[in-house]
A protein has these predicted regions:
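Helix-helix packing/entry segments at the starts of transmembrane helices
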Residues: 97-103, 168-190, 223-259
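Specific alpha-helical transmembrane segments that line the substrate/conduction pathway
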Residues: 35-46, 86-119, 158, 239-258
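Transmembrane alpha-helices of multi-pass small-molecule transport proteins
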Residues: 31-80, 107, 111, 130, ...
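Membrane-interface interhelical linkers
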Residues: 1-17, 44-73, 86, 116-126, ...
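Hydrophobic/aromatic residues within transmembrane alpha-helices
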Residues: 29, 36, 40, 88, ...
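Hydrophobic transmembrane alpha-helices of multi-pass small-molecule transport proteins
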Residues: 48, 72, 111, 120-141, ...
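C-terminal-most transmembrane helix of multi-pass membrane proteins
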Residues: 1-3, 41, 52, 140-141, ...
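Glycine-/small-residue-enriched transmembrane alpha-helix faces in small-molecule transporters
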Residues: 1-39, 44, 76, 80, ...
Length: 288
């Protein structure tokens, strides 16, 4: 096996572990979900924006109003994802929430087919049907592990929101670098969260240092050690391999939740969650 691929697989594992920790950190937070999301994006922008301004160079001069508008829309979708998913973790089990939010791939597939004329094979439709069936069962399961229909519904809505973010990003990344795209999108996401804080009357200031540290952990582990590492791994590994590896996130998160919070999924959650992950994995296989 080439050294590059071996290294990439090790880094990919770190990325999966980083994203798995995010659900645990959100569960530890005692602040409102919007505050946790705002702190995460605040730290992310603070850490990434200076480097983006320096590395973007002349590309910033080529950014159009349309680019800014689409990146702003992408940021709004990402903000909704964080707000919805973080809130779901307060109402349902970590296992259910992370499994349901992984259906992002399915929402992306459907959106790509409906909006961009993308084609889905018969096997792909079968995979989508399996994931939808599993999601439906899982949404009403989990009573033994603190799951609620509302919390599971929020996780699914969060998956749909991040799928919209992904679809816009797929279009924008054709002519914008990762540096410029993420800088614009994350900034728009932070602004959106601050607006939501204001509209809902959520106090951003006055929370103890613990909450700021949780936000910093989310920015470092999930954004810098998670999504950014996934992007780096695509230089050595196939998108299908990376997507399949990301499905380990709900498994790792569920194990950590079992150890730290005593959350043990009941049989219905195990079966339906397995159906969801199997459907997503099967669809990923059809896209290889």
């Amino acid at each position: 096996m080439p050294v590059g691929r071996s290294r990439a697989k090790g880094i990919l594992l770190l990325g999966v572990l980083g994203t798995a920790v995010s659900a645990i950190l959100v569960r530890y937070s005692q602040a409102p979900s919007l505050v946790t999301a705002t702190y995460r994006l605040g730290w992310t922008v603070l850490l990434l924006l200076p480097a983006a301004l320096l590395r973007g160079g002349a590309e910033w001069k080529r950014v159009t109003r349309r680019d800014v508008g689409l990146c702003a829309l992408s940021g709004v979708c990402l903000a909704l994802h964080f707000a919805l998913w973080f809130e779901s973790l307060k109402w349902t089990s970590v296992a259910s929430s992370t499994a349901l939010v992984s259906t992002e791939v399915i929402f992306v597939a459907l959106g790509f087919a409906l909006l961009f004329g993308g084609r889905i094979s018969r096997l792909g439709w079968g995979a989508i049907a399996l994931a939808v069936a599993g999601s439906t069962v899982l949404a009403f399961a989990g009573g033994g592990a603190g799951g609620t229909v509302g919390g599971n519904g929020l996780a699914l809505a969060g998956a749909a929101a991040v799928a919209a973010y992904t679809l816009i990003g797929r279009y924008q990344r054709e002519h914008l670098s990762t540096t410029v795209y993420t800088a614009l999108t994350y900034t728009a996401c932070l602004i959106t969260l601050l607006v939501l804080d204001g509209v809902t009357g959520t106090a951003v200031w006055g929370w103890p240092p613990r909450e700021w540290l949780i936000g910093l952990g989310l920015a470092v582990f999930c954004t810098l050690m998670g999504h950014s590492l996934f992007s780096w791994c695509l230089r050595e590994l196939s998108p299908a391999y990376v997507s399949a590896a990301k499905l380990c996130e709900p498994v790792f998160a569920a194990v950590l939740a079992g150890i730290l919070f005593g959350e043990i999924p009941d049989p219905a959650e195990w079966i339906s969650g397995g159906m969801v992950l199997a459907g997503v994995l099967l669809y990923t296989y059809t896209e290889r």
